[in-house]
């Protein structure tokens, strides 16, 4: 586990390459270094900032706009990066847009994942049900378009809004810096909505668990 008020990115990567749980070779003949159940823990009030990783603010801004738009069109995704062409099964859509899955798609009861978690917290501040499910039964098929995030859990303890993000896989270089930033934004968005409803809560901890990194 990497703990702190900011993230020492070099330390994060160093442990993957120099203290891996597994070293394998993929179908392309590339050597892969992997740590399993690898987590980042940001204490309350921390910044989702990775020291030592010069991430692109421009890319994150565009990614955030894409998430908020809820678009599943590949033509919108490739405006961020051509990488997204590899994630589309039909060459037209990308269904793993986190904003679409969490903020736009509604279930049979009429709620988005974000609204459900919010309602759970508002109904009972001690709830253990404030979970946003990303990877669901609709993703149970062989695809290039499977979300890396499995679920997000919010919990209020001692008036602190804590968040846990669990990812089945997370690319340390291309994924982690932007995923941590995105979920930090979502963490603060939930805090803002709960405060607006009158709950006396503060920003709590954020744990980012990567089952494979």
Labelled PLM ranges:
Residues 1-213:
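Terminal, non-catalytic protein-protein interaction segments that mediate quaternary/complex assembly
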